[in-house]
Amino acid sequence: MPESICVLRLSAIGDCCHTLPVVRTLQSAFPKSPITWVIGTTEHKLLEGSDGIEFITFDKSDGFSSWKNLRRQFAGKQFSVLLNMNASMRANMVSTAIPALRRIGFDRARARDFQWAFSNERIAERHPDRRHVLDGLFQFAEYLGVTDRQMRWDITLSDADRQLALDVTSGPGPTCVISPCSSQRARNFRNWSIDKYLELIDYLQNQYGAQVLLTGAPTDIEKHYAQEILARTGNTVTSLIGKTTLKELLAVIDAAKLVICPDSGPAHMATAVATPVIGLYATSNPERTGPYNDQQLVANRYPEAIEQEFGKSVSEVRFGQRVRSPEAMDLISVADVTAKVDAVLG
């Protein structure tokens, strides 16, 4: 049994949601071993207060200064085990500020950005090769001899978080949360079109009398989506875009009957609170990054996008291969999504 465990997973929201049940599993297996988690400041805002976990935040925007702060916080301390569950050069640098006897990283094939050079032990190679990100993270627990998974998240929410959610979901009809946009990165085309969202909203309202809530961050693209959708639906939709904290958003998702979103954090937040989620996937493989417990609800046009982009089948390309085409998400039809809606609300 390790005397102490440090988990290093800085980001992003979805991946930290994947990491949490692994940490819960380690807590169950090693109840006397304190667990520290080095996490990004944004992600900490969602997971803050999770029982039995000491969080140490790292501000990615503050770079070297944050690294020095970590060094100071860990001065005189040594962990039995460091689980570096974040294969990136930034995480590699952060790991050098964490004193640990055993420094466990990914196997060579998954140890991106030379992570293998910052580890002295590695988890087993992935077999079968095509596994969900969450399954890959559970290999860290398995490496420590723990195979009994605890698929629980138990993210702490306040009474105020719950009350806000109750206030915005108490209208007639089922509450459907639409988080229309993913985080914006270069050549990362994951967003469905506004026109298709409008058709979907019309179906939700007319077929099920649904109360539709838009959620998201206050980015320019998300605010644009909200403005267009509100204007073209006659304000029959409520926009919470840029108006909630992450914990408030989780409470809203928990209170909703359904979440619809592209490959993004809210898909995995919904998984954490067992709210059905329809994932919109064409540019990334849902077998790897889809909502873990709702694969059957994914509107999946990834195979068609791969064929269109590479002239190959999914099995012929690298697992996790991205499609960098701005047209790929248009392969998902409104009918693809309404069929999944009917499976949940019908």
Language-model-detected regions and their locations in the chain:
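Catalytic machinery of carbohydrate-active enzymes
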Residues: 1-346
